[in-house]
Amino acid sequence: MSEEEVSFSRDYFVEMDVRDEEAHELASDWFDEVVFTKKLVLEDPPDWGSLKEELKELRGKYGKVALLLVTRKPSLIREVKSRNLKALLYVQGGDMRINRMAIESGVDALISPWFGRKDPGFDHTLAGMAARRGVAIGFSLSPLLNANPYGRAQILRFMMKTWQLVKKYRVPRFITSSAESRWEVRGPRDLMSLGINIGMEIPEARASLNFYPRTIVWKL
């Protein structure tokens, strides 16, 4: 099935990253599928048994679950990836070593590689590697909501530059709220508007909420 066939067969939208119970409930009213994301901040390896049990409970409650790894240690990405956690694996971008390791390790998605940076954190080399390894780039709305006007303008500029590379190299991608509260949840139209604002055509923005998310969710 082609990107265009999936995108325009009907309005079917997927929210790939919601991190709060109330946010998930609200997003479920607006999207056909919602992935609940557990945020995991690591400096050292976790208790794997406890983590697997928690993810099992979350799958029972929400169905589709992702694990967002936030770490300063690149080696932990490979370690988490090697475990059979039965959840999508996202990595919070920012540190260039983390961005590179996430892509090299073949995680499901790198979220906001520009996060906290003075540049996009994503270049031609990483774009080519992400395309080959099927690592999606997550364009997240949440940091924009929490930034001052200067910060928002800078983030949008980094998003635009990243989108140009994503488009050129045909990197998988999705647009998401990354909502950590119900107040940060936005519907498909608002997320599509973000895509259009960073340079996507309407079909490209739609595919970032439909075709690409669905191909990722099918892994579960």
Curated annotation (Swiss-Prot):
Keywords: Cytoplasm, Endonuclease, Hydrolase, Nuclease, tRNA processing. Pfam families: RNase_P_p30 (PF01876). This is Ribonuclease P protein component 3. Its EC number is 3.1.26.5. GO terms for cellular component: cytoplasm; ribonuclease P complex. Part of ribonuclease P, a protein complex that generates mature tRNA molecules by cleaving their 5'-ends. One of its GO terms (biological process) is tRNA 5'-leader removal. InterPro entries: Pol/histidinol_Pase-like (IPR016195), RNase_P_comp-3_arc (IPR023539), RNase_P_p30 (IPR002738). Consists of a catalytic RNA component and at least 4-5 protein subunits. One of its GO terms (molecular function) is ribonuclease P activity. It catalyses: Endonucleolytic cleavage of RNA, removing 5'-extranucleotides from tRNA precursor. PANTHER family: RIBONUCLEASE P PROTEIN SUBUNIT P30, RIBONUCLEASE P SUBUNIT P30. HAMAP family: RNase_P_3. It is found in: Cytoplasm. Belongs to the eukaryotic/archaeal RNase P protein component 3 family.
